[in-house]
Every structure is written in C-alpha cells, then in structure tokens.
C-alpha cells in the first residue's frame, strides 16, 4: 500500500500543473515521499527540489494529499472512517517568496 502511495505522490507532484489552475510545469530534480507509521495514524512527508526560481510547495502539498488519498482508497474496505487531516507546509527554502519554517 505504501509503495503504491509513494508512486501516486510522485505522479501527483509531476502533474501538479495539470491539477491546479494557473500552476506551471517545473523542472523537478527530486521527489521523496516517506511515511511514519504511528499507532493511530500514518504521517506522510513529501520533499521536493527543483532547478528554478519558483518554489515547489504546491507540488509537495499535492503529492502529500494524493499519497494519503491513495492509502485511503486502498484501505477503505477495512475502515471507511479514516480521516485525512492537518496537511501543512513545514519547510520551504528558496523561491521568489523566500524561506519559510513552520513553528
């Protein structure tokens, strides 16, 4: 399930410009989707780098959401009450708007 979710997240990051209006195609260098398995949840971390002046936070957020939706889709037969919550930008370096780190 997690491997399929990683692949889905990578595809989502690469295709963000087709999903989000006014987003443009970026020259993505690397995409890393990882998961932390907790007792009551799965945490997804998406890390993306690109060769350009624009940030990749929308691509990372899109990758995270699609990865989690894939897990939901593949596990809904076990529990339809799963909740996808608290998606947020944790760290951004570079880009036109500068750096950001969540508190």
Feature names for model-found ranges:
Residues 2-24, 29-103:
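C-terminal binding/interaction regions
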